[in-house]
Amino acid sequence: MLVVCASISVHAASPINCAKITNETERTVCGKPSLLQADARMTTYFEIATQLVAMGQRGDLQDSQQAFPALRNKCGTDKACILAAYKKQTAPLEAVIANVVTHGPF
């Protein structure tokens, strides 16, 4: 079992704040529990993954995460498109975590 304790950097991975919706895509995410769950999963995986990689790769992950809202927002209110965007963004983060679990740095 892997236990990860990490200080969390929220500047690049803040989840959607449903009290401060700024566009129709965020409104769609906030109105659909499965999309909110996808947002929370992506944010959590980002926070963990950035603590497990070297600085160069961390910067790449941060750049990708900062660009994500603009890509997601191109979906408008299309729930399937939004979910696909979250899955595409989350996949490399999951891969980082899986790689550490199977190969370690330990």
Predicted regions, residues:
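Bacterial N-terminal signal peptides
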Residues: 1-7
